[in-house]
Amino acid sequence: MIGFTPPSGIYTHIAGIDLVRTSEKEFFVLEDNVRTPSGVSYMIENRETMYNMFPELFSKIKVRSVTEYPAKLLKALKASSPQLLNDSTVAVLTPGMYNSAYFEHSFLADQMGVELVESQDLQIIDGRVAMRTTQGFKIIDVLYRRVDDMFLDPLSFNENSALGVPGIMDVYKSGTITIANAPGTGIADDKACLLYT
């Protein structure tokens, strides 16, 4: 977004970098995934299964643990809160259960101990994004979105979107919520950008 700096100046909170191994000591970046990177939950689950089946293999070749990923992700998301509070409220925005990565959305929300929300759970109240809870609405400080840019806000992008939150881009521009990753970061996914890295 031209002329706008997101809260904390952070555009890319999470990146999924695809690597290809060309020799024993050489790796190349195949592509960058920063729009809505996906796949980490499968890696965590796969690693846990492999460790349970072959614990001696993991100790023998010194495979690093990935079990701390959800806690580190939550810490990074909270650190990007516009209010910079220790008790910032984080939520994961999912397109819903029919999305191919829904398992990951629910897995990460559960592992981080945050709410998994859909657009109908959210509302703009007094210039803030709030989620419905059994005790009423609760303000969200950081929204880890798993919804593509074009569907994020029907008032700013695709007007037919039922996956986004009407007015969320205005709230974002006001600086009262962090959206991870920032809308527009997907430009870095474009292969043409690899010339400039």
Which residues make up each language-model segment?
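Class I SAM-binding transferase module
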Residues: 177-188
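P-loop NTPase catalytic cores that bind/hydrolyze ATP
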Residues: 191-192
